[in-house]
């Protein structure tokens, strides 16, 4: 099965938080699935952010295929952070046809801390010629939760 996990802040043990997507992906790969994580190149949660030169730049980490989307840097929970959310979602919408064409997802999991990624997941599902399962994982509702 081809699994696409959308998480703006996904990281790895080397980079730092957010770890949840990384550990899910590792387990799915052990079960024989292909996993792609779509994440922003900048996160205030990480110790180390990836250095990328273009949107959708690929990097394989412990067998997990990451696609990095460039977003601006920010500090805190202010307006600049909200702008990066719009950047991330907008670029995913623009890249959705290529995600469908090259990744061929069977399941799309939307797992960011804000609900806008669900709209991208719905769009990817709509563009796909096959039946795609869409899952929205609610684990933190910024800015409602501290």
Model-flagged regions — what are they?
Residues 1-65:
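N-terminal subdomain of nucleotide-sugar transferases
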Residues 8, 41, 111-113, 139:
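Short, well-ordered beta-to-alpha junction loops that form the rim of enzyme active sites
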Residues 8, 12-13, 73-82, 102-103, ...:
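Acceptor-binding helix/loop patch of EC 2.4 sugar-transfer enzymes
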Residues 17-18, 79, 118-119:
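Conserved strand-to-helix beginnings and helix N-cap segments that scaffold or border functional pockets
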Residues 38-100:
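A conserved catalytic-core segment of Leloir-type glycosyltransferases
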Residues 45-46, 116-118, 144:
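Short catalytic/ligand-binding loop motif for oxyanion handling, primarily in non-cytosolic enzymes
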Residues 65-67, 96-117, 131-135:
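Short N-terminal targeting/anchoring amphipathic segment
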Residues 120-124:
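A short acidic, amphipathic alpha-helical/loop segment
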């Amino acid at each position: 099965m081809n699994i696409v996990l959308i998480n703006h802040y996904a990281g790895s043990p080397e980079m730092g938080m957010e770890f949840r997507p990384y550990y899910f992906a590792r387990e799915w790969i052990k079960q024989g699935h292909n996993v792609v994580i779509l994440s922003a190149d900048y996160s205030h949660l990480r110790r180390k952010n990836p250095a990328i030169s273009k949107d959708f730049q690929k990097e394989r980490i412990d067998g997990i295929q990451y696609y990095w989307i460039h977003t601006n840097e920010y500090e805190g929970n202010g307006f600049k952070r909200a702008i990066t959310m719009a950047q991330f979602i907008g670029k995913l919408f623009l890249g959705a046809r290529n995600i469908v064409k090259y990744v061929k997802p069977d399941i799309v999991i939307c797992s960011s801390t804000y609900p806008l990624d669900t709209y991208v997941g719905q769009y990817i599902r709509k563009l796909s010629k096959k039946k795609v399962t869409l899952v929205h994982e609610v684990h933190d509702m910024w800015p409602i939760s501290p």
